[in-house]
UniProtKB/Swiss-Prot annotation:
This is UDP-N-acetylenolpyruvoylglucosamine reductase. Its EC number is 1.3.1.98. Cell wall formation. It catalyses: UDP-N-acetyl-alpha-D-muramate + NADP(+) = UDP-N-acetyl-3-O-(1-carboxyvinyl)-alpha-D-glucosamine + NADPH + H(+). It is found in: Cytoplasm.
């Protein structure tokens, strides 16, 4: 019989069901689990993992991960709260936010406070601590544009630290936290937000939806409305949001594509490359609304993979690999999954392995 083990402020639990904690609703059991509310909790959890020779899997909002049925590792569930104003002037406000804050709730809070910049990122699932990891983005805005620094516990140096936005090396769905995922545990994120509205409306149908009501609140509401009209609620249709990254191709590759598919949605990048809409590729490959067993691509948004009925990780992999195959056959583009894949030892695996 397993017993819970208590430390100063933290509790280790055994054989914990993680289905409520991952938005794809995969049936997953963790051999060891703890919820951390402070840096001291993190240090105690890491000491426990070292003592028991366990790998560590850091769980945030569970909205960007693919988990196996059994994880033999210590799952550290982040629950560090707090929204603290550090400083402000007439143009900017600096705010330090706990990694365990719900992202969407934080965005709503900034709008109520008349802090601007994050409204395009409303309704993205997950927690604040996960936002820098893959540099979350939507409707022409990436969170890295408004991050000043990221506060971390450095597992290599065994101490806390702060990493500037420049040193995070933010790019499309990427940061240093993806390059070295086992080193840093994000504890807080410091944002530098605008105090004067500067609405970004140059993406898709957003400008038309906002119309003449050029307020941050209306922009936020329109983003929420558009997302709700296209994207399924994970509580009703378990999913991880956009399942594939929008592929970025060079000029030569784009010229080949546009010559063959003249209506392909595309977005020129600053470096001369071109971003292609993955959802369109999936739709054209015949996968919008199509299922393979209990897993399929959503009928309103082909980019979203849905667990329709108690799918396993094997079911999910079978489906997304079939989508990759069909898209590659038609367009000679290999789609890259966004969510992180873990093995039963709590370690990150490559999707191609």
């Amino acid at each position: 019989m397993f017993k819970n083990r208590f430390f100063n402020t933290m509790q280790i639990q055994n054989q914990v069901q993680l289905k409520p904690f991952n938005t794809l609703s995969l049936d997953v059991t963790a051999s060891h689990y703890t919820k951390v509310k402070s840096i001291e909790d993190i240090e105690e959890a890491l000491a426990f993992a070292k003592e028991h020779e366990l790998n560590v899997l850091v769980l945030s909002g569970g909205s960007n991960m693919l988990l196996p049925q059994q994880i033999n590792a210590l799952v550290i569930h982040l629950d560090i709260q707090g929204i603290d104003v550090l400083s402000e002037d007439q143009d900017f406000i600096r705010v330090k936010v706990g990694a365990g804050q719900v992202w969407h709730d934080f965005v709503l809070y900034t709008t109520k406070q008349n802090w601007f910049g994050l409204q395009n990122l409303a309704l993205i699932p997950g927690l604040v601590g996960a936002s820098p990891v893959q540099n979350i983005g939507a409707y022409g805005v990436e969170v890295g544009e408004f991050i000043e620094s990221v506060q971390v516990y450095d597992r290599l140096l065994k101490q806390t630290g702060s990493i500037s936005a420049a040193d995070c090396h933010f790019s499309y769905r990427h940061s240093i936290f993806k390059d070295d995922p086992a080193r840093y545990i994000i504890t807080h994120v410091t944002f530098k937000l605008l105090k004067q509205a500067n609405l970004k409306l140059n993406y898709g149908d957003l400008k038309q939806a906002v119309g003449d009501n050029l307020t941050a609140e209306n922009l936020q509401n329109q983003v929420i409305h558009i997302r709700q009209s296209k994207l399924p609620d994970p509580k009703e249709y378990p999913n991880v949001g956009s399942f594939f990254k929008n592929p970025i191709v060079n000029t030569q590759e784009f010229e080949r594509l546009i010559a063959q598919f003249s209506t392909i949605p595309h977005y020129p990048q600053a470096n001369g490359n071109v971003k292609i809409a993955a959802g369109w590729l999936i739709d054209q490959a015949g996968w919008k609304g199509k299922q393979l067993g209990v897993v399929g691509m959503f009928h309103k948004q082909a980019l979203v993979l849905v667990n329709y009925a108690n799918a396993s990780l094997a079911d999910v992999k079978k489906t997304y690999q079939a989508v990759q195959h069909d898209v590659e056959q038609r367009f000679q583009i290999m789609l890259e999954p966004e969510p992180v894949l873990y093995n039963n030892l709590g370690l990150i695996e490559n999707h191609t392995e």
